[in-house]
Amino acid sequence: MFKRVGLIAGIAGPVAGSSRFSAVSFSKRAFSASSKRCTYEEERAVLDEIQPLLSEKDIDASKKLRNIGISAHIDSGKTTFTERVLYYTGRIKAIHEVRGRDNVGAKMDSMDLEREKGITIQSAATYCSWDKDNESYHFNLIDTPGHIDFTIEVERALRILDGAVLVVCAVSGVQSQTVTVDRQMRRYNVPRVTFINKMDRMGANPFRSIEQINNKLRIPAAAIQVPIGAESELKGVVNIIDRVAIYNEGSNGEKLVTGPVPEDLKDLVEEKRALLIETLADVDDEIAEIFLEEKEPSVDEIKAAIRRATIARKFSPVLMGSALANTGIQNVLDAIVEYLPNPSEVLNTGLDIAKDETKVNLIPSSTQPFVGLAFKLEEGKYGQLTYIRVYQGKMRKGGYITNVKTGKKVKISRLVRMHSNDMEDVDEVGAGEICATFGIDCSSGDTFTDGTLKYSMSSMFVPDAVISLSITPKSKDSTNFSKALNRFQKEDPTFRVRFDPESKETVISGMGELHLEIYVERMRREYNVECVTGKPQVSYRESIQSSAEFDYTHKKQSGGAGQYGRVMGNLSHIENSNTNNFETAIVGGRIPDKYLAACAKGFEEACEKGPLIGHRVLGVNMLINDGAIHAVDSNELAFKTATMAAFRQAFLESQPVILEPIMNVSVTSPNEFQGNVIGLMNKLQAVIQDTENGQDEFTITAECPLNTMFGFATSLRASTQGKGEFSLEFKHYAPASPQLQKQLIADYQKKQQQK
């Protein structure tokens, strides 16, 4: 595997590029799935050792490069923000809005569906340049979706980026998906600057949002700007570090004008500047020393401390403005240059498969052997488009790279930099760059090298699907139907397809109703396939609450070659686990290794379809510690069958339970509908966790069984006159109510009898 130091591999669902049984571990001793999280100080020590290995050319190229993602809660203004970035960096000549009247739409929303719905569905990459202090800096920029149903797009972007801009709404503050994005940034150790957007909106309060960032996200954050004016009177911002007022002028805010701090803001500027220094003193030793000596740090010392603390992921500087009002965006571009890391300041490591998976540090030098990660696939006009982050070495047009997983050597016939759905051909890209290429048959998460190295990379965390529905093409010609499903599965690891042998139906699974609805619509538009879908179904899980011993013999001997396999051991519950585990403790070789491997396969298959209702099994440990073989009749099939039967027997004796997905629900609505919304949540068996009352609207956060949430969007619209909005995110699995469990088991048994 390959991982950024500190990444904890996700085990909640199959990982892109891995087998479908990746959540099951097989070893002769208990398997530990967690990895040690390194501190930034440990990373820094390794980076200091790598630095002398870089040439001046490598260092210079790296210093001028930033790989940045734009992330936020839905409707916080990410895509509008990115549109301004493209305009001010000269990448586009005119600004178009997400829901523009000209029917053009924002550049980064290239799909028709995105422009129609006004949301980002796929992450989009672009490349632009920004000039600061007479130097030109190059940004690889990825705009990500804000809706939880498309969370894999955020995961795969943050997996390969070095820094991020977290966009927060000045009115709504930290919202449910903001918390999710924060968790994703921590998972991949991505430092961030924060931009408080929509400062021109009524009710905007940046300092309340900063307080929420500190309290809810638990990361020290402080303003480095204060607004000039408020709401519709927003005129600009004051840079409190330099004590300079900055105004956006021109038809699109393209001209920056500086001036003295307005008289009525001087006290606020000094107050927030003192708070900034105090916050930095808590996270940076050099500022702490100056602070304790009761001296005032210089401007350069403050900026250096912000950079150190931001890259160390101990602090986030907060800027503010309004993307829609063309205010404050250029300041964020300056902050990206000043405070976010370049590729040589981020430690990435890999495992050398040729040396028993020894950990190796990747060197961000273009003179080193090539190592890259395919992190995203798209079907383009010219075939499969594969996005690759280059960690080490170079990629050249006409050159060859090797897929470490398959061993297949492929030629790079075309190399491009992406600009949303447009592309620009390039001859080569170096370490730290992000590019795309055509004609490579691979999966998302595959590692590529120049063929001299056998380094392997881990893929991104892939959450488990929580909702399924049956899907059938209206036409008997299923060629395009199969093509679409195969393509979508390959592109999106959270989109799963299976054939149900009992109902004889194709079943698709994903992260939510919108997620699956989008794919059904894309089939119609892109493949001309009209589909009929069934009622959404919850992805339940089966588990146990106690343990049981087993001693099972599978015997089939009726003359000639037969089958014989005996397995003994126990089945037990793994507390708070999203995995299943198989282990052996055989003494004296009573069961040969080849039969134990068959036992592991039997366990994997048994976990795919539980005994209660045929859903996947979760949180179970199976130990085989004894058994017996027959000199003639024992074989792999016999031991696989014996293991599956032993599993079923012990499972039903271990207090089996059906688990249902519990969702984290966040509902925001005008205050006058609060009673209606609370009543609606109570009907859904929701447990309300928190209620926040704002000036005009309120937000309720609750935990609710997914089973009760179908049709919630319609109910919420009816209860709030169409003014309420909500977001759903999977929280955890919990035992379903006894009544629901009985009903599910009865329905399953009835289906089995009808077969």
Swiss-Prot record:
GTP binds at residues 72-79, 143-147, 197-200. GO terms for molecular function: GTP binding; GTPase activity; translation elongation factor activity. Pathway: Protein biosynthesis; polypeptide chain elongation. Residues 1-38 form a transit peptide. Coiled coil: none annotated. One of its GO terms (biological process) is mitochondrial translational elongation. It comes from the Eukaryota. Its main location: mitochondrion. Keywords: Elongation factor, GTP-binding, Mitochondrion, Nucleotide-binding, Protein biosynthesis, Transit peptide. SMART domains: EFG_C (SM00838), EFG_IV (SM00889). Residues 63-344 form the tr-type G domain. Pfam families: EFG_C, EFG_III, EFG_IV, GTP_EFTU, GTP_EFTU_D2. One of its GO terms (cellular component) is mitochondrion. It is found in: Mitochondrion. Belongs to the TRAFAC class translation factor GTPase superfamily. Classic translation factor GTPase family. EF-G/EF-2 subfamily. NCBIfam families: EF-G, PRK12740.1-5, small_GTP. Mitochondrial GTPase that catalyzes the GTP-dependent ribosomal translocation step during translation elongation. During this step, the ribosome changes from the pre-translocational (PRE) to the post-translocational (POST) state as the newly formed A-site-bound peptidyl-tRNA and P-site-bound deacylated tRNA move to the P and E sites, respectively. Catalyzes the coordinated movement of the two tRNA molecules, the mRNA and conformational changes in the ribosome. This is Elongation factor G, mitochondrial. The lineage of its organism: Eukaryota, Fungi, Dikarya, Ascomycota, Saccharomycotina.
